[in-house]
């Protein structure tokens, strides 16, 4: 399944994400749920040595407050491997109205994919999505450190 995920992961999308991570004045990540917050925390810790500091929001109220302060020079990563609740969708929509660049790390048919400027597609299965995100973190680390 990792070989399939690697084949389905667009090199262009990874390069675009890498570029946006480097150019953004601030990077924020919204994630809710046990698996998603753990994966977002991993992403946060793995990208720090590359000089990418990610503000992780895993609280619904904090997401709304954060979304209201974002601007067009920020980057918002929205990580969802399963269904996103309405609070996460609402905070993402609020960030979108603020002009923030949003990249969704989610299955392509997910509602949050429609709110994003770009999407890094994850498999529908939460377990496979977890492996896909681990692969993405490794790809980002390899390209950011190079």
Label the predicted regions.
Residues 1-13:
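HTH-adjacent hinge/linker in prokaryotic transcriptional regulators
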Residues 8, 20-23:
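Membrane-interface junctions
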Residues 11-17, 62-66:
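Short, charged beta->alpha transition segments
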Residues 23-145:
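Glycine-rich phosphate-binding loops that contact phosphosugars or nucleotide phosphates
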């Amino acid at each position: 399944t990792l070989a399939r995920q690697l084949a389905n992961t667009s090199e262009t999308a990874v390069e675009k994400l890498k570029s946006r991570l480097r150019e953004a004045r601030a990077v924020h990540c919204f994630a809710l749920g046990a698996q998603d917050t753990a994966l977002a925390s991993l992403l946060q810790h793995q990208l720090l040595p590359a000089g990418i500091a990610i503000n992780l929001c895993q609280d619904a109220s904090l997401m709304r407050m954060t979304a209201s302060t974002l601007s067009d020079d920020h980057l918002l990563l929205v990580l969802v491997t399963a269904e996103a609740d309405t609070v996460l969708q609402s905070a993402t929509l609020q960030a979108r109205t603020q002009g923030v660049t949003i990249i969704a790390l989610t299955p392509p048919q997910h509602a949050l994919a429609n709110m994003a400027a770009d999407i890094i597609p994850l498999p529908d299965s939460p377990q496979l999505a977890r492996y896909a995100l681990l692969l993405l973190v490794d790809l980002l680390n390899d390209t950011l450190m190079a």
